[in-house]
């Protein structure tokens, strides 16, 4: 997998936009050459050896729970794991021990959760290019998809999420919150960091959401958390 999320300021320091992408910035209604035609004829399996890079946000886990019928705790026993991401404990998809492939990859090397796959997988080979904590574009990453003859498709259709405006608003809210948490960690003790991480896991991942009311309930929990922590 590629970068997923990259920052303008980081890229200006380390690498240029043209080095990792086609150099263009895309919005939801733009056409982009990413359509793989369901990966037909592709001999490369891109869902192997991703390590801990498929980090899951609360909406990813909400959708996985609905699709698999498993609770967050049950998913932790099977397909996902917890790891540290810049000081925050966040879930990611686990790799299979023997094949090093995604734990949701079937015996036929096809995705078993395609209809409710995580956001990083939905975007691929697109990534988000963050101008700051609250504004992003999409970029088409270089050398990520091995399929030949990709065709053009509208970004919103490629991502395939209903009500993408609400989804994008949520993505920005969660991203901004995590960045605030990461900045706050510098002034906390080890015990306080542990408490904050457990709070976030319980509040946004473990606690269930009412069907079709994810975005509303998430926003309520987020606002309460920001007020409580004075962020």
Report each predicted region and the residues it spans.
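Short, small-residue-biased leader/transition segments that mark boundaries at the very start
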Residues: 1-7
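Short loop/turn segments that flank or connect secondary-structure elements
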Residues: 8-73, 77-231
């Amino acid at each position: 997998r590629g970068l997923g999320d990259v920052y303008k300021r980081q890229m200006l320091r380390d690498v240029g936009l043209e080095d990792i992408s086609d150099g263009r910035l895309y919005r939801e209604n733009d056409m982009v050459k990413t359509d793989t035609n369901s990966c037909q004829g592709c001999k490369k399996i891109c869902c192997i050896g991703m390590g801990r890079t498929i980090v899951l946000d609360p909406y990813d886990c909400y959708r996985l729970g609905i699709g698999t019928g498993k609770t967050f705790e049950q998913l932790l026993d099977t397909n996902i794991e917890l790891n540290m991401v810049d000081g925050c404990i966040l879930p990611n998809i686990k790799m299979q021990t023997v094949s090093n492939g995604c734990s949701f990859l079937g015996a036929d090397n096809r995705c078993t959760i395609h209809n409710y796959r995580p956001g990083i997988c939905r975007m691929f080979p697109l990534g988000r290019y963050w101008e700051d904590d609250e504004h992003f574009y999409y970029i088409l990453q270089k050398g990520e998809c091995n399929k030949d003859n990709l065709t053009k498709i509208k970004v919103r259709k490629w991502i395939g999420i209903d009500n993408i405006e609400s989804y994008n608003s949520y993505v920005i809210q969660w991203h901004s919150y995590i960045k605030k948490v990461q900045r706050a960690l510098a002034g906390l003790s080890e015990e306080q960091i542990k408490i904050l991480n457990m709070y976030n896991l319980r509040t946004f991942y473990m606690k269930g959401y009412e069907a079709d009311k994810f975005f509303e309930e998430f926003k309520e929990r987020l606002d309460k958390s920001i007020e409580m922590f004075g962020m």
